[in-house]
Amino acid sequence: MKTLIFFWNLWLWALLVCFWCITLVCVTTNSIDTMASLLVMCILFVSAINKYTQAISSNNPKWPSSWHLGIIACIVLKLWNLSTTNSVTYACLITTAILSLVTAFLTLIKHCTACKLQLEHGILFTSTFAVLMTNMLVHMSNTWQSSWIFFPISFTLSLPFLYAFATVKTGNIKLVSSVSFICAGLVMGYPVSCCKTHTCTATAAGLSLSSIYLGFTGIISTLHKSWAPPKRGILTFLLLQGGVLTTQTLTTELLAITSTTGNIKGHEILLLVCLIFLWCLYVWQSFNKASLVTGMLHLIAAWSHTGGCVQLVMLLPSGLTRGILTMIICISTLFSTLQGLLVFYLYKEKKVVAVNSYRQRRRRIYTRDQNLHHNDNHLGNNVISPPPLPPFFRQPVRLPSHVTDRGRGSQLLNEVELQEVNRDPPNVFGYASILVSGAEESREPSPQPDQSGMSILRVDGGSAFRIDTAQAATQPTDDLYEEVLFPRN
């Protein structure tokens, strides 16, 4: 605890000095990008300070999440390229970045200890951190022109994986974080095209493959523990969307490597916007249930991204590259279409369950000759799923037997009984279950026999539906159990 508090205090002071150095860089370079980075760092700094002070003053501290420090470290490394001419700013930025990563690592260890981290989660967490540290060292030891953008992207995509397996979250979040780490591994493989030595190429390729392997390990571990009938639908839905995001990330990266045309700025913006939108929907659905709206939005955004990729693929000179990218695009389109069909199927099943909410077990009515333990196989005495309603019965009400007695003639209802009648919501189908005494059953067949086996029972000038079964003839007349429907007038 003392070590963690020491590093937090050291990180806060280093970041304050870093703000001063970055402000000098903003003044000297007049860069909008640097000013925006400084603004983001200020927001994250204030949020981290707020949680840090609450943790210090509380008896049961809840330490800030390490993603604050990770993003700040990425921004600091991004600004490191702008300060190569100033040794003071260079040293300040590097020190702040290292302190941010170390403090983030210690904070994650604190979270792991508090949550009683399991062994496999600890192995995944340690391996992930080793991959990220090696990736950072590879980027710092090389002088690539555009390498700074790929390390923040890969680090940001790796943060959900670290957070999910360090705090032992639910299966949906673990699955999404594993897919995110696979995409981070794909982004880590981009520097392979920029490496000038075999050591750099081998290191970057090893980092990429290690991240992809850890991501698939997380998916298998999550499915092994959470693959239960109640969650199979949403997990399959998230797996299909994860396949869409993985293939589209790979397609975008390959297009960035192989594309040689300069006038594709509009297509790049379209691809970037679609990917960001897809990731936002994907993360949002990991915390919520799948819905028809999000599934359709995901389908539209995925097809828009596919259309932009197809136009860029047609501009490539190599036939082999076009063939590989076309195959990946077809796989992405298949995944996106399947997730759209699946979310429509899940919504349809949910709607059927919602409409059929009237299918519930009703209380059984016993006669004087029966007791509570009497059990006969008469279908009318144990009705669970009633027959389909006629189309003109849309808003029936639930009438208890003490309110209405059709066997002795209907009476006018007073105000209290009307309130009891209209107590249920109008969209719920209800039934009035009564036992008619002195009823005469019609032995004549129905003029229009129904497949459900229903016959007409005449009661004092009225009619009631009864389920006709093979055992009905053996039951006494006073044991008949009718289902009488009363439509709302």
Swiss-Prot record:
Ranges that cross the membrane: 29-49, 63-83, 89-109, 121-141, 148-168, 175-195, 200-220, 237-257, 264-284, 296-316, 324-344
Keyword vocabulary terms for this entry: Host cell membrane, Host Golgi apparatus, Host membrane, Host-virus interaction, Membrane, Signal, Transmembrane, Transmembrane helix
Annotated membrane topology: Multi-pass membrane protein
Signal peptide residue numbers: 1-26
Localization: Host cell membrane; Host Golgi apparatus, Host trans-Golgi network
One Pfam family per UniProt: Herpes_LAMP2
Main location: host cell
One term under GO cellular component: host cell plasma membrane
Self-association state and partner proteins as the record states: Interacts with host LYN; this interaction modulates B-cells signaling. Interacts with host ITSN2.
Reported function: Plays a crucial role for reactivation of the virus from latency, early viral gene expression and virus production. Modulates host signaling pathways including activation of MAP kinases c-JUN-N-terminal kinase (JNK), ERK2, and NF-kappa-B resulting in the activation of AP-1 and NFAT-dependent gene expression in B-lymphocytes. When expressed in epithelial cells, induces the expression of several inflammatory and angiogenic genes. Also interferes with B-lymphocytes signaling through interaction with host LYN kinase.
Protein name per UniProt: Protein K15
